[in-house]
Structure formats: structure tokens, C-alpha cells
Swiss-Prot record:
One of its GO terms (molecular function) is structural constituent of ribosome. Keywords: Chloroplast, Plastid, Ribonucleoprotein, Ribosomal protein, RNA-binding, rRNA-binding. InterPro entries: Ribosomal_uS14 (IPR001209), Ribosomal_uS14_bac/plastid (IPR023036), Ribosomal_uS14_CS (IPR018271). This is Small ribosomal subunit protein uS14c. It holds the Pfam family Ribosomal_S14. Its main location: plastid. Coiled coil: none annotated.
Length: 100
């Protein structure tokens, strides 16, 4: 089980990414469109003034049950441990053990 502080930190980052997504996208589009160097510098400064944690690449996928950051299956939103436990308990519809 991951520390609660790490899970909470990740959820705050996700909220910041969602909050600033449209503004960040608009600034990036404006930077691409502008031709003057001075205006581009001003727009880049505005982009840099946004919070650091509002960048989508700082998000990390975590298991919804345990908060484990590694061994994450994005189709289910679970770590490999919880995926295996839930599959054995028949809690995931359509998931069966492989047999050949």
C-alpha cells in the first residue's frame, strides 16, 4: 500500500492538470502562431508562470485500490497484484486465466 500522502499528491496533480489544460493548450497554440520574437517571449513567460505540477507529464498512473505506482494495467486501473486477486475472485467480467 502506498503512502496516503503520495496518493493525495497525485490526485492534486491531476486536479491541477485538468484546471490548467485549456490555458496551457491555448498558450502553446499562440506561441506556434506568432511570428514576432518579442511576443513569443512574453507568451513563453506566461507559460512558465503556470504551476509546475500542471504539466501532464508529471502525472503517474497509480492503482485505484492500493495506490501502487508500478505494475499498472491501464485497461483496468489496477496494479498487477490487485488484478490477479480480482480475476481469481471472478470480480472482473470477461477475464479468465489463460489455458492452452
Amino acid at each position: 500500500m502506498a503512502k496516503k500522502s503520495m496518493i493525495e499528491r497525485e490526485s492534486k496533480r491531476a486536479a491541477l492538470v485538468a484546471k490548467y489544460a485549456t490555458r496551457r493548450q491555448a498558450l502553446k497554440a499562440a506561441i506556434q502562431k506568432t511570428k514576432s520574437f518579442d511576443e513569443r517571449l512574453v507568451l513563453q513567460h506566461q507559460l512558465q508562470d503556470l504551476p509546475v505540477n500542471s504539466v501532464p507529464c508529471r502525472l503517474h498512473n497509480r492503482c485505484t485500490i492500493t495506490g501502487r505506482p508500478k505494475g499498472y494495467y491501464r485497461d483496468f486501473g489496477l496494479s498487477r497484484h490487485e488484478l490477479r486477486a480480482m480475476a481469481h475472485g471472478c470480480l472482473l467480467p470477461g477475464v479468465t486465466k489463460a489455458s492452452w
